[in-house]
Amino acid sequence: MFLGLGRFSRLVLWFAAFRKLLGHHGLASAKFLWCLCLLSVMSLPQQVWTLPYKIGVVGPWACDSLFSKALPEVAARLAIERINRDPSFDLSYSFEYVILNEDCQTSRALSSFISHHQMASGFIGPTNPGYCEAASLLGNSWDKGIFSWACVNYELDNKISYPTFSRTLPSPIRVLVTVMKYFQWAHAGVISSDEDIWVHTANRVASALRSHGLPVGVVLTTGQDSQSMRKALQRIHQADRIRIIIMCMHSALIGGETQMHLLECAHDLKMTDGTYVFVPYDALLYSLPYKHTPYRVLRNNPKLREAYDAVLTITVESQEKTFYQAFTEAAARGEIPEKLEFDQVSPLFGTIYNSIYFIAQAMNNAMKENGQAGAASLVQHSRNMQFHGFNQLMRTDSNGNGISEYVILDTNLKEWELHSTYTVDMEMELLRFGGTPIHFPGGRPPRADAKCWFAEGKICHGGIDPAFAMMVCLTLLIALLSINGFAYFIRRRINKIQLIKGPNRILLTLEDVTFINPHFGSKRGSRASVSFQITSEVQSGRSPRLSFSSGSLTPATYENSNIAIYEGDWVWLKKFSLGDFGDLKSIKSRASDVFEMMKDLRHENINPLLGFFYDSGMFAIVTEFCSRGSLEDILTNQDVKLDWMFKSSLLLDLIKGMKYLHHREFVHGRLKSRNCVVDGRFVLKVTDYGFNDILEMLRLSEEESSMEELLWTAPELLRAPRGSRLGSFAGDVYSFAIIMQEVMVRGTPFCMMDLPAQEIINRLKKPPPVYRPVVPPEHAPPECLQLMKQCWAEAAEQRPTFDEIFNQFKTFNKGKKTNIIDSMLRMLEQYSSNLEDLIRERTEELEIEKQKTEKLLTQMLPPSVAESLKKGCTVEPEGFDLVTLYFSDIVGFTTISAMSEPIEVVDLLNDLYTLFDAIIGSHDVYKVETIGDAYMVASGLPKRNGSRHAAEIANMSLDILSSVGTFKMRHMPEVPVRIRIGLHSGPVVAGVVGLTMPRYCLFGDTVNTASRMESTGLPYRIHVSLSTVTILQNLSEGYEVELRGRTELKGKGTEETFWLIGKKGFMKPLPVPPPVDKDGQVGHGLQPVEIAAFQRRKAERQLVRNKP
């Protein structure tokens, strides 16, 4: 694009035009017209006969207050005026500027940039790296130069793809890499504030560092709250080997609150102890003043000053004068409005100024070279430039990018000024020591990383040679595989030997067991006339059902008996009579695998697997024999009396056994009352676990179960294909719920529904409605019924685990252990004549004590909180938007205590607080606590009451003040008891604090303000804040208040406060406040007259006592 041809070229055009006039008019008139035109042209100002070049300064000036502090309008005007006055620039064109606002959201920022197409001839910007590449491509398309100091995108260095883009400052990444290389800090973390511009900056910084081969561990964004900052810093702390943390946000030194709070949070987490170095990214974009420049934020914030000891500030060196000095000089010359103070301006002002000069110098070079100022030509002629910027000498390299010298600034714990330590030479890309060492926390910098991270053309693996690392890993892998293979071979060999030999053999034959006729001999008790007729539905997974008959003395064989003696103990054999089991060698190999999986299952409530029996074509599982039979047998035997303690003991045994199985990652899959056996000590044990694994071991397919057998199966398993019903953890919980129903009603599953099993199964498969047993409430405690319903929930994920079931079940018995023997003894004692009376009497006493305990608890805590604590629930902190707080104390309490005996002080407080407690009972208020003579009451919590809280507290305060007016101390009746009262309304957070003697406490600024209202009040006065007065006036209930005036509240400044002096319809007398002295003050203790009267009376009493 051609913007001008020079003054001489324009004059040539004028001459050509007037030569044509000579051909059409007379000589005299032509000469006259020629002179007139020549004089007119020469008298025109420069701006008329030169072409303008308008520079658009793009940035988030309207939506970011800290960017707007750079005063882009003032900086651009100052630069443009100086350029247009500078005779060294080509005068064939003039410069203008326009301030273009960039939206703080990236998508909108790009859209607004496109709309700026016709508004400028070239652009300084963008400021947001999120759309720098898109803006550069648009600039190329528009043939308009893009000159940016903020685009960190390393892709823009490609001049072929982006010929119209140029940096007015060195790439911040080059500066960072130079510093990181010098200190050997390779591992970096990047954290940004949550504004779009900084989030994109952080991502581009991380990408650029990674393009240099440096490991960036984390790239995080933090919010403004401390919780978000703490979480982000903890993630950095957990990341591996991070040395340097780059903070992409506004610097705390120029008003960036996010960075200030972030550093304070890092200080609290002890991350500023020298483990990490923090680098503010934005300081790389401008020249931060440091010579004789104290920073108030460091002086006023000791925590930040300590944290800043771990910060290295890298900024553009101000070689000639500081930014503030240059700004002050320009203001003194009238170039900048006088009302602007230099410390209110961001140093980014100088960067904007320098960028405009950058474009002007490039334009000047292009026009002198070839008279053309296209965008690509401007970028090309910005190479190897040198000009004076706002407060330093500016140069460019052979690529047209700015070259500036940088300085590393540091501080220490004693100062709030920054001082120079190193300079960063960007031409040589090295650091030069400036004479003052860096003060690192702990006396030394963070640990250095391996040098290979900064070696070009070399892949770094944390300092370990890749070939060596691969060789070590391969050697270790081969060794580990060899050891595991050898160990596995030895173990398999030992297991095979143990299968049939030695004391731990698991594959038994007829030589190892002796089948017996199932009658009890002397070992099991005198039951010679009883024998067992035992049937076993093995393939269906059904455990033995025991029936009794007399006189059965048939000889026992493996064919007609399931009971045998093995090593002196009775065992039960669960037979598998179907299928082709193969030869003994095949059985050995498969039995070893399954037994290895099941042999370690040892628990009091698990029936242990003793081995496998294989002989004469029969295979069986060998387990301990339980003489009481299955749980189903006990439930159907009406001769066995079961109270709830007995039932809960059996259920608890079942829970313990299943909990153990699930902890070992074992799914039962066939849990039912028939698979729960009870031994002679009435201990329930779970059996038939691992049934599916045994079927697989024997290569048997599962036979279809009868409908009655499926009543314990979970609905989701019923809907599954028959071959895939291998069970699940949630399915076992459902089966347990059905067993609970059996135990509660002493009946079969779904016995109360009076439907055939086929119909029940169909309804279970196809809800809605959800079909479950109905258990009357009188059969079990409500808590137990509720647990049962949770366990058979339709959604499997909603069912509790056995750990949760165990924890709930323990609470049903108040933590007492269930014991079958104790239960039987208690059943026998119930026949005693006085047992019922004794139980009733004890129950009544327990209920009375319970009521006393609950009453005491509700006096200490709010009823709702107390109820939650009784249920074992956690009381979460609760926020209240608006409550009213009451604080009062006794005026002169210290003096009264000094003149009284300790017991008299206790009596005084007890009498006074008893009076107060009686008064607050008639108001909707909650007594929070008493500490010494301080009395604290709240309304609006824990039960919310709308806007009534202010009225309730005000009414209570008037009642208390009235009652105190007539209150007399027993030991000092002549000394009046004066109180001062403070009221304030606002938000609070309430919660229970502590485990031992828990307290219901209030937190928030409202509590502090209410306390300040009391402490700045006067005797016999109710001191009320503006917030409370506003609520009382809105209620329109006739409260009478008078303005006290502006009152100094500690930590709050001066606020307008009021006195509450009464209420329409309140007829009780109020005490007269003491008079105010001539200085407007009143005594905050006892008056000398009152003290003297008391001492005189005390002396008289002492004299009376001493008389004989």
From Swiss-Prot:
Signal peptide, first to last residue: 1-50
InterPro entries per the UniProt record, alphabetical: A/G_cyclase, A/G_cyclase_CS, ANF_lig-bd_rcpt, Cyclic_nucleotide_synthase, HNOB_dom_associated, Kinase-like_dom_sf, Nucleotide_cyclase, Peripla_BP_I
EC class name: lyase
Keyword Thylakoid: no
Pfam families: ANF_receptor (PF01094), Guanylate_cyc (PF00211), HNOBA (PF07701), PK_Tyr_Ser-Thr (PF07714)
Disulphide linkage map: 104-132
Post-translational modification: There are 9 conserved cysteine residues in sensory guanylate cyclases, 6 in the extracellular domain, which may be involved in intra- or interchain disulfide bonds.
Source organism superkingdom: Eukaryota
Transmembrane parts of this sequence: 468-490
Catalytic activity entry: GTP = 3',5'-cyclic GMP + diphosphate
UniProt keyword annotations, A-Z: Cell projection, cGMP biosynthesis, Disulfide bond, GTP-binding, Lyase, Membrane, Nucleotide-binding, Sensory transduction, Signal, Transmembrane, Transmembrane helix, Vision
Topological category with respect to the lipid bilayer: Single-pass type I membrane protein
Effect recorded for residue 1055 to D: In a lung squamous cell carcinoma sample; somatic mutation
Extracellular side: 51-467
EC numbers, comma separated: 4.6.1.2
Residue stretches making up the Protein kinase domain: 532-812
Activity regulation as described: Activated by GUCA1B when free calcium ions concentration is low, and inhibited by GUCA1B when free calcium ions concentration is high. Inhibited by RD3.
Alphabetized CDD domains for the sequence: CHD, PBP1_sensory_GC_DEF-like
A GO molecular-function annotation: GTP binding
Subcellular location: Photoreceptor outer segment membrane
Tissues/organs with expression: Retina. Localized exclusively in the outer nuclear layer and inner segments of the rod and cone photoreceptor cells.
Domain description: The protein kinase domain is predicted to be catalytically inactive.
Family per similarity comment: Belongs to the adenylyl cyclase class-4/guanylyl cyclase family.
Subunit-level organization: Homodimer. Interacts with RD3; promotes the exit of GUCY2F from the endoplasmic reticulum and its trafficking to the photoreceptor outer segments.
Protein name: Retinal guanylyl cyclase 2
